[in-house]
Amino acid sequence: DPDLPWKTGGDYILLCMQKVGDASLRGRDVFAWTEDTVNEIRKHTNRKIIIRPHPLYRKSALHNKLKEKVLAVADVHWQEADLTEPDFVTIAEQLNNAWCTVTYSSGTGIDAVINGVPNVACDTGSMVYDVSSTDIAEIENPFRGDKKQWTNKIAHCQWSIEEFESGECWQHVNKILYG
């Protein structure tokens, strides 16, 4: 809701991982990014950090190695995102008490911003880059951009039913694909 005010409180920083190998990472190693980001956050704040791995990737040796490394950092916690587990916590529940989220280009940043939770976007490919902090150093005073302008902008990235029915959408896509 663009009219929902930005939150100014919260209990922790929610660091949201992305699916390993996801194209939106542009070749970046999500494990290295997560470890580096935890260490960078810790340089700027002592707030509790909760790491939320992507729900479609878990229980690998690399995942467990990362978990071991980051949990050695003071007040860092790991929240599994396995829907089948009895202690599963939804992203909506986690956003309720989050000070802010930190994302690379994850769609979770969209959920955060829509719900008034500030976000730190670590890549220009993030859909919430315009309404997010872009520097971890701002974590204690995250940017809270104009959500109304942002929602208008992203709404114009979609096609209407009429544009599908008229063929305008296909003509546009076809031109991009085939010249």
Give, region by region, the residue ranges found by the protein language model.
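Short, solvent-exposed loop/turn segments at secondary-structure junctions
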Residues: Q18-D22, P55-R58, T84, G107-G109, ...
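Leloir-type glycosyltransferase catalytic cores
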Residues: D1-G10, Y129-G179
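Short, well-ordered alpha-helix to beta-strand connector turns
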Residues: G10, N46, A74, N97-A98, ...
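Catalytic donor nucleotide-activated moiety binding site of glycosyltransferases and closely related
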Residues: V38-P86
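A donor-sugar binding/catalytic signature common to diverse glycosyltransferases
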Residues: P86-S133
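Conserved alpha-helical elements of sugar-nucleotide-dependent glycosyltransferases
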Residues: D29-T37
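A nucleotide-sugar donor-handling region in carbohydrate enzymes
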Residues: D1-V30
